[in-house]
Amino acid sequence: MATAERRALGIGFQWLSLATLVLICAGQGGRREDGGPACYGGFDLYFILDKSGSVLHHWNEIYYFVEQLAHKFISPQLRMSFIVFSTRGTTLMKLTEDREQIRQGLEELQKVLPGGDTYMHEGFERASEQIYYENRQGYRTASVIIALTDGELHEDLFFYSEREANRSRDLGAIVYCVGVKDFNETQLARIADSKDHVFPVNDGFQALQGIIHSILKKSCIEILAAEPSTICAGESFQVVVRGNGFRHARNVDRVLCSFKINDSVTLNEKPFSVEDTYLLCPAPILKEVGMKAALQVSMNDGLSFISSSVIITTTHCSDGSILAIALLILFLLLALALLWWFWPLCCTVIIKEVPPPPAEESEEEDDDGLPKKKWPTVDASYYGGRGVGGIKRMEVRWGEKGSTEEGAKLEKAKNARVKMPEQEYEFPEPRNLNNNMRRPSSPRKWYSPIKGKLDALWVLLRKGYDRVSVMRPQPGDTGRCINFTRVKNNQPAKYPLNNAYHTSSPPPAPIYTPPPPAPHCPPPPPSAPTPPIPSPPSTLPPPPQAPPPNRAPPPSRPPPRPSV
């Protein structure tokens, strides 16, 4: 009776697992389209799963966890194996990179019926056997083991489990442990590489989905790119290896960069720097053009390697002399062009006559060809003066027609009202479209500030070019070259002295020489008649330059005569 109930319960679990698988695949496909975290590392991944009786009612959660995590490792160079343990260990799927076989292995894993004791060391033995045989075949691929259990191990079982885990590590494997619910964290920390390699799940099997991202991040060791990817043949260089998980090794000092040259020779180099996302490694010298080096990384001092699809190729490189010669020729051509442009400015001097200023065009001209002037209009202005001596009074009225240019020279009366002529401004009319609508202003573009600055720079360069081009002699101009000669002055400079006492020979002053006096004649006798007055000499002294001090200037006009 108990056997029949157990079979019925197993069939029910199978149907429930099948329905769950359909839902999981549908949901997983949608999540993969959205894009999520994935691992591109090329290594061997072993799942060691506890199928003892304590997980009988939680096997679906374990399967769901493994199925989701397996789909995160998408490298074509990654191989996977499924191992279960209870009283003994069983390999459900041997190591393979075939995705179809991995899908079939997941189906076999779903059909597992838990039961028995927790002999974890049996699962590690099955993994170590595969690692050993793979290494003997020469693959030497890095291995990652993820072991899951839910209970505490007995003292003797813990001893065997730790021993087998150390054996797997000696073969080059990295061991991670997942503990669910009633596990002993101290035991798992000794079985795994370190305490950081343990993922506790204290909230039960339902919380396994929450650690998938953490396991993927810590267990994934991948090589994504190499810089540079193309090198010069026969030259030494350094390569930067980009990737993830390079510090997940137990000992960072055991990390190596490996170069597999033409799939035949493997050369290992110690990196200069080891970070979680990159390695700085010296690369070997590849002497021939066309050689290829596949990039690998070892986390255990060359015991096993993490492969990748990153390849470094060699090419022929020149020594740079051709480029240097080309740059030198371009520089010489540029120097000759500048010399041809600026040599006339430095040597030839052209003197040109200044052109007369252009005559300003006036809108209105009078009869003489002179532009008419607008004079102010003045009312009630009286000015005196007409006729000889200004005797007759003259009345001048500036009316609406304005005055003449001569009238502007007269003095303005006190009661005059001046009206200045108004200046008329013509504003440009806005341009209208055919439908009598004004053209809308164009919207401001995002590149308008940049375009404005470039236009201003272009205007500045254009002005400088125009200034230089105007100074250059035109064809047909003649001139002469400037010769600069330094003349040495032997006489030292003297300070000018303005004091007359210090001058040795003052300039001669003009001396006025009066004319000779007239000859003295004796007085005539009293009875003699009076002789005529002699005429003045023909030569007279020059008149004085300034007028006499007591003489007043003549009036500007004669005073008015009184009316009779």
Curated annotation (Swiss-Prot):
Residue ranges occupied by any VWFA domain in the UniProt entry: 44-215
Protein name: Anthrax toxin receptor 1
Organism of this sequence: Homo sapiens (Human)
Membrane topology: Single-pass type I membrane protein
Spans through the membrane: 322-342
PTM summary: Glycosylated. Glycosylation is essential for Seneca Valley virus (SVV) attachment and entry.
Keyword line: Cell membrane, Cell projection, Disulfide bond, Glycoprotein, Hypotrichosis, Membrane, Metal-binding, Phosphoprotein, Receptor, Signal, Transmembrane, Transmembrane helix
Assigned protein family: Belongs to the ATR family.
Chain positions found as Phosphoserine: S362
Localization: Cell membrane; Cell projection, Lamellipodium membrane; Cell projection, Filopodium membrane
